Amino acid sequence: MITADSRAAATALLEGALVIIPTETVYGLAGRADHPDAIGRIYAVKGRPSSHPVIVHVADPDLDASRPGAWVSDVPDYARALAQACWPGPLTLVLPRSDRASDAVTGGQDTVAIRVPAHPDALAVLRAMDELDPAGAPHGVAAPSANVFGHVSPTALDHARADLADRLAPGDLALDGGPCEVGVESTIVDCTGAQPRILRPGRIGAADIERVTGMAVLDASSSGIRVPGAMPSHYAPAASIALAPDPAALEAYVDAAIVGGTQADAIGIIAMEGVPTPEGATRLLAPASADDYARGLYDALRRADATGIAFIVAVAPV
């Protein structure tokens, strides 16, 4: 059932139901993070491997590891600085877990991924959970993307319902918060070492992190931490995709696809506004900015699948 009532959504979550909630990145399939049955249902509904960790979403950006109910056990100064600068927002921090963070949430690792979403509806739900059950505060929800595992992430409620409506139980809810503002998943940063390490790229980049922390940012190459959204099957449409490095290369990619047997009208183009669409191809997205590119990308990939596009050429935004 679709609802606009954040308190109804919070009540459902506290009772162990699942709720599709909007965030600024993508829609999430939320379940109470300290409720093992709810976490188990998230994995079952999505068809997600149980070894794959989920992100705990909370309303309070205070990363005090000493307070009762904390999800983390240790917070370095640079992680605290990132939280203060970037939360609420599309940044997930990986930190040493507390006893409250179960193996179901962490994928059996000794770390937990945590963030404060920036969407007002998501924050309203989380705050309502704390108000309705203050003894259990600070509450958190696990909220991986509200889609079948491996499919393109949903940036509108219709996307999520198309994937999950027939998999949810009668007591589960969906909260419509409109289109997602960012449109791609949060940046994930490992904060368990002496320096921050990006484990998954997103809206917040290395330069942003360096500016806040004053530290060089490491890449994920030497990290053994499993994180959400980092498997090869993630975010994949049915169509094949090629990434053209610049607009000048677009025609060559399209020509190669046609020579390989793909009909021109089954080729989809994602490129910045002003980049011409090759003759016969289908334009999927023509954004005016890099932010618009990110915001519209997943919707374009879903439309490609819905319209029978077999091959997509995406020109990198420059």
Regions found by a protein language model. Give the residues of each.
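Active-site-adjacent structural elements in enzyme catalytic cores
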Residues: 1-318
